[in-house]
């Protein structure tokens, strides 16, 4: 019996360590126009976005942040998601057109995914679950929640949806 308990504890620890050793860079994502997007050794701000949300004007500030820091080992990656009151109903093509026409978005936009629920994308499982990222549970509260990933692919933290892309927490982290 003691052997069985020891074996179970060992397996649980191994599974836990495996999840904690997983990096952001271990995931594959697809751009809004259907191309593979390599996650590389940059600081990354991951944001779930929506076109018909009260926070949609954050696209402008995200673009400003991207323009200011894109040459300093930093990128923003937007993930359209329709998880909150149907505020991102469009197709990938419609979302891309909206972002370009209304906010001149040039930071990488990925294909539409789910950021919560049973069909949550694996990347967002890692971003939101301590058992996956090894750091903290951080369920997505609403559109425009921001996750910070360091240049080694490690989860650093998150910023609430209503906080500005230029919040002190984000800017300090980028400039470290």
Spans of features found by a protein language model:
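Bacterial Sec-dependent N-terminal signal peptides
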Residues: 1-22
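A short, compositionally biased
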Residues: 21-26, 141-142
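A short beta-strand-turn-helix
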Residues: 26-44, 64-69
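Amphipathic alpha-helical repeat scaffolds
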Residues: 31, 48-52
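Sec-exported extracytoplasmic/periplasmic mature domains
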Residues: 51-54, 67-71, 100-104, 128-132, ...
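Structural microenvironment flanking redox-active thiols in thiol-disulfide oxidoreductases
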Residues: 55-120
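Thiol-/selenol-based redox modules, centered on thioredoxin-like
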Residues: 125, 129-176
């Amino acid at each position: 019996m003691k052997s069985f308990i020891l074996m179970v504890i060992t397996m649980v620890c191994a599974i836990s360590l495996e999840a904690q050793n997983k990096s952001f860079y271990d995931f594959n994502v697809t751009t809004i126009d259907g191309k593979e997007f390599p996650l590389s050794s940059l600081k990354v701000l991951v944001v779930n976005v929506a076109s018909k949300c009260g926070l949609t004007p954050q696209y402008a500030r995200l673009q400003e942040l991207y323009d200011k820091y894109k040459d300093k080992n930093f990128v923003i990656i937007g993930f359209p998601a329709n998880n909150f009151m149907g505020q991102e109903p469009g197709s990938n093509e419609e979302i891309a057109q909206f972002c370009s026409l209304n906010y001149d978005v040039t930071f990488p936009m990925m294909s539409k995914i789910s950021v919560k629920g049973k069909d949550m994308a694996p990347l967002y499982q890692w971003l939101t679950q301590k058992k996956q990222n090894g750091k903290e549970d951080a369920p997505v509260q609403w559109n425009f929640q921001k996750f910070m990933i360091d240049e080694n692919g490690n989860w650093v933290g998150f910023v609430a949806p209503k906080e500005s892309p230029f919040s002190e927490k984000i800017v300090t982290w980028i400039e470290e």
